[in-house]
């Protein structure tokens, strides 16, 4: 995840990309620089998908359409959004051949909501331990297990405080997508960190 424009360096564009499948434009960049940041990344990196972490809450079809217009392959919406918003986002993403990731941050009843989102056609359901809970030592592992146990069609993503030295425990639960932010972006050697994460996910 790129959360600050200073992180969007040639290292990420040309080297880290060799070890990732999706590069995320984090919410802080979207807030500070707007969707042109998504376009910029899309224009300057090849061979990986671009995820725009908009954390949509309302006007979902419009916001998805704008992210897609600027080159996003995957767009995020909050799981606490209204069903009508999520259904509209799914429809807009799929109409354009793109994917929707539903972020479960702040969802209280994970099991029930995951089932509902699965039925609505979400491409990814992401269990997410936010920065504020990470500071309290909360891990996404239990949430990951809960969501995996109840969904039938959606893929499962996991995010929140994952680093090269903790990713093996997460990877052991076989999520479809592991989202690593600061564990790569803030590492002394981001390329080596990305390489370690990829190896852990692939079980090497």
Task: Describe each region flagged by the PLM.
Residues 23-25, 50-54, 75-77, 100-104, ...:
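Hydrophobic faces of well-ordered beta-strands that scaffold small-molecule active sites
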Residues 59-69, 109-119, 162-177:
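Catalytic cores of alpha/beta
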């Amino acid at each position: 995840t790129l959360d600050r424009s200073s992180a969007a360096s040639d290292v990420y564009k040309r080297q880290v990309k060799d070890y990732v499948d999706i590069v995320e434009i984090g919410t802080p960049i979207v807030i500070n620089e707007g969707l042109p940041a998504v376009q910029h990344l899309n224009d300057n990196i090849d061979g990986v998908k671009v995820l725009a972490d908009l954390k949509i809450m309302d006007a979902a079809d419009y916001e998805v359409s704008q992210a897609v217009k600027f080159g996003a392959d995957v767009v995020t919406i909050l799981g606490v959004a209204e069903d009508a918003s999520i259904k509209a986002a799914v429809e807009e993403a799929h109409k354009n051949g793109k994917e929707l990731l539903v972020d479960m941050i702040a969802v209280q009843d994970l099991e029930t909501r995951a089932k509902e989102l699965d039925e609505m056609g979400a491409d990814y359901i992401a269990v997410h331990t936010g920065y504020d809970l990470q500071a309290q030592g909360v891990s996404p592992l239990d949430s990951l297990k809960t969501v995996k146990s109840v969904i039938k069609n959606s893929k499962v993503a996991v995010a929140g405080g994952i680093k090269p030295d903790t990713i093996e425990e997460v990877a052991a639960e076989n999520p479809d997508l592991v989202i690593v932010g600061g564990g790569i972006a803030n590492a002394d050697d981001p390329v080596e960190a990305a390489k370690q994460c990829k190896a852990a996910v692939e079980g090497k």
